[in-house]
Amino acid sequence: MHRGYDFFRPDYLCIGTEVNEIYRDGGPQKWNAYAALHQQTYQELKKEHPDLPIFASCTLPQAFQQRGGMLAAFQKLMPYNDLVAISYYPFFVPEKDRLAALDWLPAQFDSFQKPYAMVETNDLAERLPFPKSKHIVLDGTPAKQRAYYEKLLALAQEKRFVFVISFIHQDYDALWERIKDSAPELFIAWRDCGLLDERGRARPAYDVWKAALNLPLQE
């Protein structure tokens, strides 16, 4: 970790990605082991870099409102996180909850009085049947993608997010054709999430993104 810092000199340092899934997949015992490691790593790094924002991210899962144990476990880690760092993919969430998750988020984390960051996000802009798992269909549209980015970026402006990372800039249809025989089928889920389509044409959400970038910088 120290060598990585010395090489990259980052403005922010993420020491764990979507770590709440450790609780989901491994239960409290594995989570407690991770939490001890995270706490020690955070404290040691802070001794040398007291002004560097250090954090681990969590993901908003599909049934985010029913994951009370996972939420409570991550909240206990917040004294050792300098940001509330979230990754979120609304196309995995039921229609009635996909935008509501952005209202749920500050209700759970505002009390920590720490800056927010969206470390990974995008939304699906096309209807996507999984080619092998034919019972799985993700129902994306350009309008739903635009509505998501409008709500997300309005929240980011309101809460003064330190950054928002849109994970896919352009659809990767060509890449998928090259890797589809060897990659997990799940990887197709993000194929059509670009602000630009596979031909480089801007989707409506692109205008929302550019408008947010053109807002005056607030110190």
Predicted regions and their residues:
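Aromatic-rich peripheral "rim/lid" segments of glycoside hydrolase catalytic domains that contact
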Residues: 128-129, 134, 139, 144-148, ...
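Acidic-and-aromatic substrate-binding clefts and catalytic sites of carbohydrate-active enzymes
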Residues: 21-24, 59-70, 89-101, 126, ...
